[in-house]
């Protein structure tokens, strides 16, 4: 990432916190161009354009150099919020991969706390 940035190529690291079928996180590199993003990974010392690791993906985040403009001050001391989501240096870029989407979830007010986290589940659960 830093080598590409040093020669003026706009590059970033995108990642998933949890893969639906693999129970683990994964990251890869993306180059931003005029048409969007080009995901790639180093394979045998070569950059593979059109990279697709075939992993199912839920939410995709980007590791950023600067603090993002989002208000997370209210969650910093909350143990129920996953630590990775407390970072001011990540942003949700799912829309760059799948387009914009939304979901409505009905929550029983008698059983909910202050936060809800939409996650992915994988076998065995």
Label each residue range with its predicted role:
Residues 116-124:
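Short amphipathic beta-strand segments in non-cytosolic proteins
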Residues 101-109:
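A short, amphipathic beta-strand motif
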Residues 75-101:
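Beta-strand-rich domain onsets/edges
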Residues 109-115:
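A short beta-turn/strand-edge loop motif at beta-sheet boundaries
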Residues 33, 110, 123:
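Acidic surface patches and DE-rich sequence motifs
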Residues 1-78:
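Hydrophobic/aromatic-rich core segments of domains that either
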Residues 38, 124-125:
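Surface-exposed loop/edge segments in extracytoplasmic proteins
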